[in-house]
């Protein structure tokens, strides 16, 4: 149970492993996930480390696996493993490399063959369409001249005047071009050839598949008639520039028909070959999909092990690997057992050796968590990772955080919706975890599902205390107020009811108030009262002050446990005690006055109740001559004066005494060190040849050096300034933090008012509509009301209350005892590496 409230006790050990057993031992520690390795090669470049070649081989295997994953994407479903395979031995890497490289080579060859076949299929398909279109065009060859003259082709307007032997020399080029380039192609062709060409094109009916990008492309078939070799060269250059594919097209119709038949035969053969190639490729992908996840885990584990081995020192002479590890003391037995398993797996005869190392380096902070407490621990760590072995605020945050959130968010209707959402995530967490989405917003909500669960439960509780459910009160037990006695004694009558705009119930009249308060929460009659806000504001404001001061005092008390654990007696006397005196004499007394007034002033004497605010102000001014504000109790002046004097005394108590005591202690240690040095010098002069004297000389010198080091670290000015900052921060912080807790009242008021406005402006208007239109309209209005409730009151207001609760815990609560300057324990864990949650 100790580890729940304080971080785990850690141990730094030096680990000696035989070279042959190092890999297996590190792998077993990775499976265990309880050891953090220190990098002993910080000054060595990553490319100069011992196992850099093995890491590169693993990265090469990862590249092959990424290639296989890309090939399988959207085609083959990878078979996930329920249980992670064990880390492969180093000799198994060669087998894995052979299998993956062979599979990669076969798949690349299949892809290249398939791409080449599809390219041939594309070209033959284009040629097929081209031959069909040119055949259709040449069938109208007899009317070609008429077509020329009907087109706006001024360069060939004199074609009828040209002799027959000249017209017979017209040449043509046929090809295929992308449809989006057709307009530019036609325009450039016209300008460069100055209109001395005849262009005719036709759109291909079906889209074609690009063999490289595998995207569908739309193409056009064109045929260009020209006269002369120069025009032919220009047209070919333009076609090359626009990446148009030019195909040979024979002039005789018989040859074109024969060529078309040949193309159709080749296409049929090509389709058969492509089908066989695709079947072979699918078989390769199926083989890869069956083992891909297992291969990936094995490669990642091997790579992680070699990364850890690169952080170790290797003693070539002794043939051993030296590592330094942090681990929890409570898990030492499990770690030794894992090392023994690694030794047995490797077949080594030398057992691993663990020796404890003393270090001045602060150990890492390790707080054990589960899926319930992890969210609360993350809230604490987001502010700062706790110092080693200091009090962990997370166990207290489990209760205080959702409670303070609920104080601001208190509405049992909204809390129920939040509770149902959290329960849905919790009940379906296995299915939702298996989806492994990258949506950060969803992951944030899902990882905080237990936090949302508690926030919903506490919101229902505070909502029942406020008697607030979607801005309406619940009359469960019946009101403790009655109107009839006001009429019986004649206070109210018909004339009063006609003349008065508001009527006020007088609890001093017998029977108006039954004397027994509402069994749980606030009486529902306050929801009808016009002075509801006045009553609730007073109640919530005082409640916020009480909760805030109680939490701050609790934080100061927790600092006592830190001082006791670290044996800081000086801090207990000179820091904790004056801090408690200051906060209790001032703000603890304020809580006492609030509760005292609640208990001692009932409805019969409430008219003469004094003002707590005026009493609290006069307390600091030592002003007790105000006769208009009666004292709360006897001897109030003496008690309050004593409290103020004690609070004033506690300030120099915190500020001055500790720095001077530390300076006196430092001077005393320096004086003792100088005396030891003098005695050692006299002994050396008496017998300089004695071995014991030389040993004493070394001991005294070491002691003096250590004290000198300590003396250099001590600086009275720094200590005094630090203590002054702490004192000022604490004294002013108590005042500002108490005021900061009033956000509990402000946020609760804002939430209640927004909820009431939403009900009045939206839902109430739908409920007041009568007739058939009202029946239909209420469904529409309820949908609008539900959407606005979720969007504004649950998400926006919920996020606002969440952030304010964070602020109250991080600043107002944790600064009383929590240092938070540690660093997180980051164990070498295969589970974290495979999940992608490993710390860098």
Swiss-Prot record:
Single GO BP term: sensory perception of sound
One of the record's GO cellular component terms: basolateral plasma membrane
Region (Disordered): 675-704
UniProt tissue specificity: Expressed in adult and fetal kidney. Found in the inner ear.
Keywords: Cell membrane, Disease variant, Hydrogen ion transport, Ion transport, Membrane, Transmembrane, Transmembrane helix, Transport
GO molecular function: ATPase binding; proton-transporting ATPase activity, rotational mechanism
Residues that span the membrane, as ranges: 391-409, 412-428, 444-473, 539-558, 577-597, 643-662, 728-752, 774-812
This protein's record includes keyword Lipid metabolism: no
Topology Vacuolar: residue spans: 410-411, 474-538, 598-642, 753-773
InterPro entries with a match to the protein in the record: V-ATPase_116kDa_su, V-type_ATPase_116kDa_su_euka
Superkingdom to which the source organism belongs: Eukaryota
Annotated compartments: Apical cell membrane; Basolateral cell membrane
Major localization listed first in the record, in broad terms: membrane
Keyword Transmembrane helix: yes
Result, substituting residue 580 to T: In DRTA3; benign
Record topology, Cytoplasmic segments: 1-390, 429-443, 559-576, 663-727, 813-840
Cysteine-cysteine disulfides: none
Membrane topology: Multi-pass membrane protein
Pfam families given in the database record: V_ATPase_I
Biological role: Subunit of the V0 complex of vacuolar(H+)-ATPase (V-ATPase), a multisubunit enzyme composed of a peripheral complex (V1) that hydrolyzes ATP and a membrane integral complex (V0) that translocates protons. V-ATPase is responsible for acidifying and maintaining the pH of intracellular compartments and in some cell types, is targeted to the plasma membrane, where it is responsible for acidifying the extracellular environment. Involved in normal vectorial acid transport into the urine by the kidney.
Similarity comment text for this entry: Belongs to the V-ATPase 116 kDa subunit family.
Description of how the protein assembles with itself and partners: V-ATPase is a heteromultimeric enzyme made up of two complexes: the ATP-hydrolytic V1 complex and the proton translocation V0 complex. The V1 complex consists of three catalytic AB heterodimers that form a heterohexamer, three peripheral stalks each consisting of EG heterodimers, one central rotor including subunits D and F, and the regulatory subunits C and H. The proton translocation complex V0 consists of the proton transport subunit a, a ring of proteolipid subunits c9c'', rotary subunit d, subunits e and f, and the accessory subunits ATP6AP1/Ac45 and ATP6AP2/PRR.
Medical condition linked: Renal tubular acidosis, distal, 3, with or without sensorineural hearing loss: An autosomal recessive disease characterized by reduced ability to acidify urine, variable hyperchloremic hypokalemic metabolic acidosis, nephrocalcinosis, and nephrolithiasis. It is due to functional failure of alpha-intercalated cells of the cortical collecting duct of the distal nephron, where vectorial proton transport is required for urinary acidification.
Name this polypeptide is given: V-type proton ATPase 116 kDa subunit a 4
Species: Homo sapiens (Human)
């Amino acid at each position: 149970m100790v580890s729940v409230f304080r971080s785990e006790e850690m141990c730094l050990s030096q680990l000696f492993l035989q070279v042959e057993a190092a890999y297996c031992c590190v792998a077993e520690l990775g499976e265990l996930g309880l050891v953090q390795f220190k990098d002993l090669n910080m000054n060595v470049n990553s490319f100069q480390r011992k196992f850099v070649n093995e890491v590169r081989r693993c990265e090469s295997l990862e590249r092959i696996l990424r290639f296989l994953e890309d090939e399988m994407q959207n085609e083959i479903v990878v078979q996930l493993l329920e249980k992670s395979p064990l880390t492969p031995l180093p000799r198994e890497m060669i087998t894995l490399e052979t299998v993956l490289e062979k599979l990669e080579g076969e798949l690349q060859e299949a892809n290249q063959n398939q791409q080449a076949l599809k390219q041939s299929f594309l070209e033959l398909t284009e040629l097929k369409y081209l031959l069909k279109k040119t055949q259709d065009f040449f069938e109208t060859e007899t009317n070609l001249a008429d077509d020329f003259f009907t087109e706006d082709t001024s360069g060939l307007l004199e074609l009828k005047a040209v002799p027959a032997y000249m017209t017979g020399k017209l040449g043509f080029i046929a090809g295929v071009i992308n449809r989006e380039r057709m307009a530019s192609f036609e325009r450039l062709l016209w300008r460069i050839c100055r209109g001395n060409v005849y262009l005719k094109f036709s759109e291909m009916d079906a889209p074609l598949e690009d063999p490289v990008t595998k995207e569908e492309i739309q193409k056009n078939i064109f045929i260009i008639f020209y006269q002369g070799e120069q025009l032919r060269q220009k047209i070919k250059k333009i076609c090359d520039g626009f990446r148009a594919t030019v195909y040979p097209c024979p002039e005789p119709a018989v040859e074109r028909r024969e060529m078309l038949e040949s193309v159709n035969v080749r296409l049929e053969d090509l389709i058969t070959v492509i089908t066989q190639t695709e079947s072979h490729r699918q078989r390769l992908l199926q083989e890869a999909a069956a083992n891909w996840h297992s291969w990936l885990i094995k490669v990642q584990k091997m790579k992680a092990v070699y990364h850890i081995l690169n952080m170790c020192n290797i003693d070539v002479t002794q043939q051993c690997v030296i590592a330094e590890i942090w681990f929890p003391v409570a898990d030492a037995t499990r770690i030794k057992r894992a090392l023994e398993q690694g030794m047995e797996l490797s077949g080594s005869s030398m057992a691993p050796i663990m020796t404890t190392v003393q270090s001045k380096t602060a150990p890492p902070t390790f707080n054990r968590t589960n899926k319930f407490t992890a969210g609360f621990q993350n809230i604490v760590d987001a502010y700062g990772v706790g110092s080693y072995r200091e009090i962990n605020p997370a166990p207290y945050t489990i209760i205080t955080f959702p409670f303070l959130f609920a104080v601001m968010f208190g509405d049992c209707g909204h809390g129920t919706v939040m509770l149902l959402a959290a329960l849905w995530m919790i009940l379906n967490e296995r299915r939702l975890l298996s989806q492994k989405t990258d949506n950060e917003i969803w992951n944030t909500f899902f990882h905080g599902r237990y936090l949302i669960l508690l926030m919903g439960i506490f919101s229902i509780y505070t909502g029942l205390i406020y008697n607030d459910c979607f801005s309406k009160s619940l009359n469960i037990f019946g009101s403790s107020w009655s109107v009839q006695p006001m009429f019986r004694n004649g206070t109210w009558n018909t004339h009063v009811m006609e003349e008065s705009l508001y009527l006020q119930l007088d609890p001093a009249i017998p029977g108006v108030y039954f004397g027994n308060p509402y069994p749980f929460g606030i009486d529902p009659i306050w929801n009808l009262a016009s002075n509801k806000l006045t009553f609730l504001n007073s109640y919530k404001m005082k409640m916020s002050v009480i909760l805030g001061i109680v939490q701050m005092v609790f934080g100061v008390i927790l600092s006592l446990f830190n001082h006791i654990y670290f044996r800081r007696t000086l801090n207990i006397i000179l820091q904790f005690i004056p801090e408690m005196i200051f906060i209790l004499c001032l703000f603890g007394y304020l809580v006492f006055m609030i509760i005292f007034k609640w208990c001692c002033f009932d409805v019969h004497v409430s008219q003469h109740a004094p003002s707590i605010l005026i009493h609290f102000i006069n307390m600091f001014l030592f002003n007790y001559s105000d006769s208009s504000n009666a004292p709360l109790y006897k001897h109030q002046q003496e008690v309050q004066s004593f409290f103020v004097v004690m609070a004033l005394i506690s300030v120099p108590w915190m500020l001055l005494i500790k720095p001077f005591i530390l300076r006196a202690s430092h001077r005393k240690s320096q004086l003792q060190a100088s005396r030891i040095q003098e005695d050692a010098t006299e002994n050396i002069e008496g017998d300089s040849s004695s071995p014991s004297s030389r040993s004493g000389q070394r001991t005294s010198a070491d002691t003096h050096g250590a004290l000198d080091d300590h003396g250099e670290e001590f600086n009275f000015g720094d200590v005094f300034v630090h203590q002054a900052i702490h004192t000022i921060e604490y004294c002013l912080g108590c005042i500002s933090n108490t005021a900061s807790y009033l956000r509990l009242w402000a946020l609760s008021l804002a939430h209640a008012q927004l909820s009431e406005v939403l009900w009045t402006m939206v839902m109430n208007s739908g409920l007041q509509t009568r007739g058939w239109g009202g029946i239909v309209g209420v469904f529409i209005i309820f949908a609008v009301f539900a959407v606005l409730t979720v969007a504004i009151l649950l998400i926006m207001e919920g996020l606002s209350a969440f952030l304010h609760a964070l602020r109250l815990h991080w600043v107002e609560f944790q600064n009383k005892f929590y240092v938070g300057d540690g660093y997180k324990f980051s164990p070498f864990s295969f589970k974290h590496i495979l999940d992608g949650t490993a710390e860098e």
